Amino acid sequence: MTFRDLLSVSFEGPRPDSSAGGSSAGGGGGSAGGAAPSEGPAVGGVPGGAGGGGGVVGAGSGEDNRSSAGEPGSAGAGGDVNGTAAVGGLVVSAQGVGVGVFLAAFILMAVAGNLLVILSVACNRHLQTVTNYFIVNLAVADLLLSATVLPFSATMEVLGFWAFGRAFCDVWAAVDVLCCTASILSLCTISVDRYVGVRHSLKYPAIMTERKAAAILALLWVVALVVSVGPLLGWKEPVPPDERFCGITEEAGYAVFSSVCSFYLPMAVIVVMYCRVYVVARSTTRSLEAGVKRERGKASEVVLRIHCRGAATGADGAHGMRSAKGHTFRSSLSVRLLKFSREKKAAKTLAIVVGVFVLCWFPFFFVLPLGSLFPQLKPSEGVFKVIFWLGYFNSCVNPLIYPCSSREFKRAFLRLLRCQCRRRRRRRPLWRVYGHHWRASTSGLRQDCAPSSGDAPPGAPLALTALPDPDPEPPGTPEMQAPVASRRKPPSAFREWRLLGPFRRPTTQLRAKVSSLSHKIRAGGAQRAEAACAQRSEVEAVSLGVPHEVAEGATCQAYELADYSNLRETDI
């Protein structure tokens, strides 16, 4: 049974009697050719020949003239190929048409899906991250496999033999190994990248730079090239005499070498990395939810963190406020939690990709070295064909996993299908990453709790910007001129960092994070305290993930905000 038989339509057309072909096959060999069995045995994947002077294959029976390796035998001058046409004819049976239609749809789906992944990252700046560069490399390898290898493999399945010559067969087999190895190594690289992203979420941009990513990808393709050139340099089985036979080499040494380098070592790294990702994700999630996460050592990054402290306020002479006994509510909202949740979600998405990869490729890389070392354990031809194409199926299914698991890729795919390459630019300036408008809610407050004249008026925007402060504090407000650490903070004060230097145009990711935080703050500030000024929340500090030398040059200013006392650590 062949792969074509598994996918063929139920059709049996009349076959021409080819006994004449057997009788004309070389001097004195007609009777032997006509009496030969329908399928000669194959030794080492090379089609066997029937006995007789000129009857290389028995075409007289009218059956398919194929070896156990799925390749046609060498017919005589008047013999038939696959029992449908004379030598040189490419007439395909109905079952071949069915297989061809299925494989053509398969190849087109693989090409289109991987093109969508590449164009999605190319046309959307917010997807142009180091992790997605590795995903693009995976899509490039799968695209090369789908466009340069699979069409010839499908043609060989439909025709039943290799029709492109011996030299091109060697090149085709090498490119096949190259693309498959590059695809598998890309998944290995992605798993390491995800571990670094989850384990060191804030340090990740400094650890995994674009230059390092480019070096890793270059090394990846070099390793894939080294694995694939072995057969071209002679590390393969003896060349079969029939040029219409073409397949991957099953030489025992090379089969073991390629299986270890292309699959087993990368799979071991992938499994270890994702086990570590799971352990780190579980421990970090618990510590963040419990509010006990502490920075170890001297941090080189800043954490976007808001501390909300409940305080009872009232008339207090010159300062107009005083502290009182009561419950102190303190919550820490950190971008680390938000970024970590994004990294964990990305790790889940890529874990699905890796799981599908193992299911697709493990059967092939288990059967290949096993059959090379122990020929008696080789599976049947039909089973091997299914296993062989199951590995190719991985290149088709990878692009289907992204839109199902990643909302960003799903939106990018939809925009591409609607011929919208880029998002429309927002009208507001690109440097404005956080906006929160004052609530006109001071009418019900006592005068001693209302914002002072030195604070920003209602309706004034609160924006985290990358530009210097356009409105310097008036000289008559010594509290605003005092250092941040020494002056008393007004109730419900929000300190705004204004970044300088290289952060003049913050990234889209930072805008998205702070925008999400804005929604949480607005939701938390919707509920007012029952007694006016009885319980106020103070947004004590805001800091961002930037190096210390950049943060030292940032300016700070205080504003009155609404009550945010019901914010929790897990809100973001």
Curated annotation (Swiss-Prot):
Disulfide-linked positions: none
Keyword Transferase: no
Record note on modification: Palmitoylated. Palmitoylation by ZDHHC21 may increase the expression of the receptor and regulate downstream signaling.
Listed GO biological process terms: adenylate cyclase-activating adrenergic receptor signaling pathway; adenylate cyclase-modulating G protein-coupled receptor signaling pathway; cell-cell signaling; G protein-coupled receptor signaling pathway; neuron-glial cell signaling; phospholipase C-activating G protein-coupled receptor signaling pathway; positive regulation of cell population proliferation; positive regulation of cytosolic calcium ion concentration
Stretches for region Disordered: 1-77, 444-488
Keywords: Cell membrane, G-protein coupled receptor, Glycoprotein, Lipoprotein, Membrane, Palmitate, Receptor, Transducer, Transmembrane, Transmembrane helix
Keyword flag Nucleotide-binding: no
Short name of any one Pfam family annotated for the protein: 7tm_1
Complex formation: Interacts with FLNA (via filamin repeat 21); increases PKA-mediated phosphorylation of FLNA.
Chain's role: This alpha-adrenergic receptor mediates its effect through the influx of extracellular calcium.
PANTHER family per UniProt: ADRENERGIC RECEPTOR-RELATED G-PROTEIN COUPLED RECEPTOR, ALPHA-1D ADRENERGIC RECEPTOR
Protein name, entry field: Alpha-1D adrenergic receptor
Naturally occurring in which organism (per UniProt): Homo sapiens
Record gene name: ADRA1D
